[in-house]
Amino acid sequence: NLDAVDVDGAVNFAADVTYADGADIITASAGTSNFRAGVNAGNSIASGGNYNVAVGDEAGTAISTGDNSVAVGYAALSAVSSNSGNTAVGKDALRLTTGSQNTAIGHAAMELNVNGSYSVAIGDFALYNQNPATATNTYNVGIGKDAGISVTTGVQNTYVGGLAGDAVVDGTNNVGIGFEALSADHGSGETAVGVRALKVSVADNNTAVGLNALTANTTGASNVAVGKDALDANTTASYNVSVGAASLTDNTTGDHNTAIGSDSLANNTTAANNTAVGSSSLTANTTGASNTAVGRSALAANTTGSNHTAVGKDALLVSTAAGYNTAIGDSVLKANTTGNYNTGVGASALAANTTGDYNTVLGYQAGDSLTTSSGNVAIGYQALATETAYAENTAIGYQALKTNSGGYYNVAVGHEALLSNTTAQSNTGIGNDALRANTTGANNTAVGRLALTANTTANNNTAIGAEALDTNTTGGGNSAVGYAALYANTTASNNTAMGLNALKANTTGAGNV
């Protein structure tokens, strides 16, 4: 065993080992397994190079002629000749490579690597100015401290932490991942994952995922951002989509928006073709545009209007300042303010809409105490149940004009038709129980089934078919026309009847024909 040796001058111990004066162990060079250790370390290994390792001082000083390299300290792989496997570990690491399968690990890592190759660098200055202009294949990665420190000139990129893509020059397929992520990148495929994510991107096909996501991205492009502050004040917009947390947080300036959860279109500015899907959905979107919102608080106090559609939960929940509305389920136009071209559809439909306009509603509680009215039409179940404050009514099925209160140009079409409408006006009935015990009269017309079914309290009647003036009460201008015509009309007035049972046992008299 050789524990310690005091060498004065260079001494050759065997054909392949030299102790140099003032140096660490140095194996003889020339071919095959190679290992060297200090001062001029790999000092131009030749005879085909081979499995190299050189360790300190000027380390791989122009290894010739390549092979599986590793160099460890000081000037590490000092301008390798003729390429091969590279790996370098410290100080100036892959100092001016030129090329092949690189990996570098610390201090200046890929220090100004000449003509790239398959790259990876891990710490300190990481991909420190990698610079292909030919001989490329540069698949870059980065990993720590200054990670992609101004990659020149781009290619496949991936950076991981520290300042990640720190001022990338010049882009390509990027990914970012941590701390300042794609910090001032020069575009291309982009994707960044955490902390400052796409901080401050110089665009292309963005995607960012967490914390400040698209942090003030400039200038827009195809965006998607997923969490925390998502499209955090993205500038200047493009095709947005955002997914959670504060979603389109104060996005500036607009474009094709879509946001999906949490605060969704949270105060989006300045609008464009919105869609939002859940949680607080279009939360106080500013300023309007083509909206659609789908769940939870849907168009939650949208400001300022535009072409709405909302679909569930609180739907048009206190919309401000309206637009072409349509809402479809749950609380539908829930106390919409201020009106416009409304349409309802289900659950509580036009639930106390305020303030009116061209309404149309379809089911469940239909015109559910619509306020304050306008063009109305309602279609099913409780139809115009119980209208407030009147206007041009039309209702179509089941309880139709169910005790409409305040009347007006009424028409109702089926089943209970004008079911006890109050307080009348220009009525028309049409089917099933038609003017069923209408109250209080007016210019009536009813058409089929029980027609003027015990209309109360009369006015200018006309009936037409089925049981026609079926025990009309109380009189009026009467006319009847078919089937049971003036069927036991009570209590008379100016009668005329025409077919089948015409004045059928008319009671009690009056103008007859």
In which residue ranges do the predicted regions lie?
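Fibrous stalk/shaft segments of extracellular and virion attachment machinery
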Residues: N1-A20
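Glycine- and small/polar-enriched repetitive beta-structure motifs of secreted/surface proteins
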Residues: D16-V513
